[in-house]
Amino acid sequence: MARTTPIERYRNIGISAHIDAGKTTTTERILFYTGVSHKIGEVHDGAATMDWMEQEQERGITITSAATTAFWSGMSQQFPQHRINVIDTPGHVDFTVEVERSMRVLDGAVMVYCAVGGVQPQSETVWRQANKYEVPRIAFVNKMDRTGANFLRVVEQLKTRLGANAIPLQLPVGAEENFTGVVDLIKMKAINWNEADQGMTFTYEEVPANMQADCEEWRQNLVEAAAEASEELMEKYLGGEDLTEEEIKSALRQRVLANEIILVTCGSAFKNKGVQAMLDAVVEYLPAPTDIPAIKGINPDETEGERHASDEEPFSSLAFKIATDPFVGNLTFFRVYSGVINSGDTVLNSVRQKRERFGRIVQMHANKREEIKEVRAGDIAAAIGLKDVTTGDTLCAIDAPIILERMEFPEPVISVAVEPKTKADQEKMGLALGRLAQEDPSFRVHTDEESGETIISGMGELHLDIIVDRMKREFKVEANIGKPQVSYRETIRTRVNDVEGKHAKQSGGRGQYGHVVIDLYPLDPEGPGYEFVNEIKGGVIPGEYIPAVDKGIQEQLKSGPLAGYPVVDLGVRLHFGSYHDVDSSELAFKLAASLAFKAAFSKANPVLLEPIMKVEVETPPEYVGDVIGDLSRRRAMVNGQEANEFVVKIDAEVPLSEMFGYATDLRSQTQGRASYSMEPLKYAEAPTSVAAAVIEARKK
């Protein structure tokens, strides 16, 4: 079957934003204008097509990024048909893993900002993730119809808060309730959308007289940015010649793709204005799969390989999301980087070295699906019924194996114990948690060896609330939840040398003998977390026992001597020891190493580390005193404040253990008018009194 849309006309984009910037509404309008959904779903009444899990509809926030395929030929049908795969990414900080994962599979992104709230804390997190994956992006300033909307203020914040080279592509005509449309600065025409047909049709009009001077100035700014794309254009521009519309657009596209500029559009998705022109900008300025560098991977022989966006190359794809569908079981969303795959084909999961058969392949529209026979380079689709695939796995041609980089997921910072209410719940709970952990790598499940309790860990209170909620709804498991526990860490502050560990047992017949001498030293927190250096000279310990020493120490790292928390940021140097021809064994050296480690750890000034969160509170000015006072009681370090006439943004670093229940307290202090976001920042040494209390509590 031949390709229906040339790959140059694909756009794989993410729509990314802070909570409540109106991202889901924006995505809904995209689906509406591209003709996919006929009734616009409103988030206010919990009926948006993209938010397909029940909790999302209740909480009005987006949790799972659904991938949707839509088609667009331009506002005035000026382009051949383009295929836009929209990946809806969550805006809540507890779900940053989902955002990271979708960033991997996007080629470009639309960053949605609220014209009133501007660049909010979460926007910065998402921005940094987009930088990390070098995703070209454009901005859409939404909610231009709201009181307090100010387009140019948001453009300014993009520059000052995100360091973006933000360049308006449009200016709004009017603002707040007088917002009527936008001026296209390249054409120098005002665009007026027809309210009667929900913005499906529009007219070009002259630029309002009172805006002429401003528009000229901003157009100059835009043309200058285009001219900077090449010396040739710069000469033409400086020589006083006009650049053609075509020259301006292709130069701007080149600079967006190189991540040198961010073009800014605006509108009000809710009022059906501006999304249509933003879609045109997606087609004109964001990359096709062929515009981005080949994806890198690792060949079976550990050399670096790559795959280009071409149907001719061997098949390679990345599984970026696994969702459980009530009707068909597991849906594995995957992005094809190269080659072609047909339903019924068998591929290799190169990470697990297992074969998988692609039974049915579907393309999703929010939560409706359409079966398709094949997918090609650049496509995003979902496979039904793959057996053993986890997010981040590579699915590729059996005869051309490659591992596309594994994604690294952050370590969870918060844990709670869950206990099934009945015996029947117990069996179902194991299954449910296993399923949920497979979908979400930032969520972990383990059994506490001492208490036998099931412990779940995640990225924040909201994250775990939602996991428990899904367990109840999707798997019908009733469970009691314990108090949230903080994931502390242990480390050392000073170096100790020549610490001995000897394991010798002589009990008739063959004995056990292992003897090691190690140094223990602190490592930089930014470093690898653990290193093992073997400096045994002259075979005082035979080579085959060295890995056992390393293993013995690594087993101790899982549960540290202070309070049983994981041990981080230390190095071990093994430099002396002895062995016995008959009695030595791997086990004996493992035990000797663990004895040496415990002895060395207690001498090396061990300390407890606690997770510190980066907390940003936005509050009306009248509550600043109360909010800061309360943060100080929580051992916060307030780093600064930033104010405009509506809100004060407070930047602080607060230990996670002090943040439980903060949402409720903040609501009552500010009558529900403040909001906050937090994300893991670093681990820092816990004060002596806190450490003592934690260690004491662990002994009970």
UniProtKB/Swiss-Prot annotation:
SS bond partners: none
Keyword Nucleotide-binding: yes
Any one GO biological process: ribosome disassembly
Keywords: Cytoplasm, Elongation factor, GTP-binding, Nucleotide-binding, Protein biosynthesis
Signal peptide: none
Annotated gene: fusA
Pfam entry (one): EFG_IV
Protein name: Elongation factor G
Transmembrane segments: none
Residues at which GTP binds: 17-24, 88-92, 142-145
